[in-house]
Amino acid sequence: MKFSLLSAIAAAVFVPFTSATPLASTTDLSYDTHYDDPSLALSGVTCSDGDNGMITKGYNTAGEIPNYPHVGGAFTVETWNSPNCGKCYKVTYNAKTIFLTAIDHSNSGFNIAKKSMDVLTNGRAEELGRIKVTYEEVASSLCGLK
């Protein structure tokens, strides 16, 4: 009886803390220089219009997004008007962190502006090409979005 009661108390105290803590996951990250262009028309990306689109949220070019150049494609954006359009991700590589706004689809991991990858890699985006990062979805306010 004592063992069951202690187990129940431990579970009641421990579980809420562990389930409330977001866990970071690992994925690939690469760059595409077309995201470096602040005049990139959002009408040409997966997250263009529709209820979840960036244009609907008031942004017409990549440069208008508050945390530009930290924008790019995300594997979580599967199709046009995805509910993951405009999501903010905390992306970390070797103790460097950026907050990335998902505006497009990526077949694998994240595909972001070279300038943004240079921030993560201390200017080594071109040399490294593709890296492993940890990421987690965070509040959109961390990307400067409403």
UniProtKB/Swiss-Prot annotation:
Residues 1-20 form the signal peptide. Glycosylated. Transmembrane segments: none annotated. One of its GO terms (cellular component) is extracellular region. InterPro entries: Cerato-platanin, RlpA-like_sf. Its main location: secreted. It is found in: Secreted. Pfam families: Cerato-platanin (PF07249). Keywords: Glycoprotein, Secreted, Signal. Coiled coil: none annotated. Belongs to the cerato-platanin family. This is Heat-stable 19 kDa antigen.
